[in-house]
């Protein structure tokens, strides 16, 4: 469902690609394109993710992902498809409209997918100064923490933690969180989770 929505969106918005800018980007070495594409994607996805926490109706979709009381790599796939589509479009659309090559686009999606699994993993590894450059389990576990106002709405980036630092939302103490999840009830089965955002609050 998410992929279909992205394909339709890309098809209809293709006319917005600006050829001179696209040609300038494609003239760059591939690795430079890849670095720029990662930054563009992560800034876009950062704001989509942040809006998913601050806009009430978006949070109702995103809460499905945050409902895991413990974190492991499978939590990366505990998603509402509409939430996933929204956040991914926020990251992918700017990359597409700038006209990056399909090879760069594919490599970016591959990295983002692998890293999403890794940062949700139930591991207690620390990586020193690298934790400021690339998202790690420690960084993302604090995004899922439920330990009070100090830890709320932090670490929205999925790739580059310094993006959170730039926008004032980075939080990375030396310890790992002890409590995860949300306070609101969430159905245990997938069908219930799909319907939950649309149920009226009592």
Identify the meaning behind each predicted range.
Residues 1-9, 14-15, 22, 28-177:
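Membrane-embedded catalytic scaffold of the fatty acid hydroxylase/desaturase
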């Amino acid at each position: 469902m998410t992929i279909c929505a992205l394909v339709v969106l890309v098809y209809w918005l293709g006319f917005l690609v600006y050829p001179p800018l696209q040609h300038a980007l494609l003239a760059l070495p591939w690795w430079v394109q890849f670095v720029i594409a990662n930054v563009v994607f992560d800034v876009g996805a950062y704001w989509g993710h942040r809006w998913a926490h601050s806009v009430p109706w978006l949070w109702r979709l995103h809460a499905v992902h945050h409902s895991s009381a413990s974190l492991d790599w499978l939590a990366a796939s505990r998603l509402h498809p509409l939430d996933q589509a929204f956040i991914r479009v926020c990251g992918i659309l700017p990359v597409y409209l700038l006209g990056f090559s399909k090879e760069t686009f594919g490599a970016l999606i591959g990295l983002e997918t692998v890293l999403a699994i890794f940062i949700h993993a139930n591991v207690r590894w620390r990586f020193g100064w690298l934790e400021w450059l690339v998202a790690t389990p420690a960084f993302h576990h604090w995004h899922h923490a439920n330990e009070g106002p100090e830890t709320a709405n932090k670490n929205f980036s999925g790739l580059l933690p310094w993006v959170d630092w730039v926008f004032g939302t980075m939080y990375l103490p030396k310890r790992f969180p002890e409590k995860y999840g949300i306070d609101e009830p969430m159905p245990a089965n997938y069908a219930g989770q799909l319907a939950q955002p649309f149920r009226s609050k009592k």
